[in-house]
């Protein structure tokens, strides 16, 4: 059976209450999970949305290895900032104000599928990030070769 993944990116606008119209292609992927519950987590320059099952796998990794390599501060930041969420009846996701402020999200945002999770970026920050990736594309060559992609 083919595993369903979050792929592609879309531009969206947050409404005045911080709600986001969740793209149908992402909600279709979400339907493949037992639970429709989501976890929204802060991640320095953006937010990440995880299906609950994916988040629980990450929590297990953090529990087993979070004390290693001085990761306790990172675990504290991420786990302390998570919010459990679900889509409303209109298919919208409420992004709490604390998380919007933390990630610098104002109105225009980009949702980017990352296979197991979705990123939410401020549109301006996303453009800067993409330019930095394009400028340093050669830096990925060795890793891509090791994966058999190049």
From Swiss-Prot:
Residue ranges of domain SpoVT-AbrB in the record: 9-54, 82-125
Subcellular location: Cytoplasm, Nucleoid
Keyword flag Transcription regulation: yes
Highest taxon of source: Bacteria
GO annotation, cellular component aspect: cytoplasm; nucleoid
GO molecular function: DNA-binding transcription factor activity; transcription cis-regulatory region binding
InterPro entries: MraZ, MraZ_C, MraZ_dom, MraZ_N, MraZ_sf, SpoVT-AbrB_dom, SpoVT-AbrB_sf
Entry annotated with the keyword Cytoplasm: yes
GO biological process entries: negative regulation of DNA-templated transcription initiation
Keyword line: Cytoplasm, DNA-binding, Repeat, Transcription, Transcription regulation
Stated family: Belongs to the MraZ family.
Subunit architecture: Forms oligomers.
Protein name according to UniProt: Transcriptional regulator MraZ
Organism: Desulfotalea psychrophila (strain LSv54 / DSM 12343)
């Amino acid at each position: 059976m083919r595993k369903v993944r979050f792929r592609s990116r879309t531009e969206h606008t947050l409404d005045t209450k911080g709600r986001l119209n969740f793209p149908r292609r992402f909600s279709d992927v979400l339907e493949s999970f037992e639970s429709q519950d989501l976890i929204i987590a802060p991640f320095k320059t953006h937010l990440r949305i995880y299906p609950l099952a994916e988040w629980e796998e990450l929590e297990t990794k953090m529990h087993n290895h979070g004390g290693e390599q001085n990761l306790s501060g990172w675990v504290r930041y991420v786990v302390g900032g998570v919010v459990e969420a679900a889509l409303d009846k209109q298919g919208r996701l409420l992004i709490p104000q604390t998380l919007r402020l933390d990630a610098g999200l104002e109105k225009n945002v980009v949702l980017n599928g990352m296979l197991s999770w979705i990123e939410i970026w401020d549109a301006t920050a996303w453009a800067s990030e993409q330019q930095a990736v394009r400028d340093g594309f050669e830096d990925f060559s060795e890793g891509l070769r090791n994966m058999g992609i190049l």
